[in-house]
Amino acid sequence: DFKKFAIINAYLLKSILAKKFSNKIKIKWPNDLLFKKKKICGILQETVNNAGKQFLIVGIGINTNFDPKNSSFSATSLKHITNKNIDNKKLLIMIKKNYEKLLFKANKNSFSELKKFTRKI
């Protein structure tokens, strides 16, 4: 059921960003992450049917190195939080590894690990 992935995606990204950058990052359901009520990440997902198979497409936008003073939206960035330039490649690799760990555990255990994960959320 792909609907659960909205929760999983938000929780996984929040966990990664909170651990690495600030524990003040919070989830705003269903698809945003906020830092002090300012948007730092947006998550979109869509299911697609192709040749009788269903696929999930997930788009993740993380504000990394922009200056929030130049934005007309209530947003912030990881650079603004940390006062450091963010290496986008390293951040992407970190996110990818965390997704791989979660999905490997889920696949290895017939998705029982994923079910446990969603129950914790």
PLM features: residue spans?
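Long, positively charged amphipathic alpha-helical accessory segments at protein N-termini or as interdomain linkers
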Residues: F2-I25, F35-I121
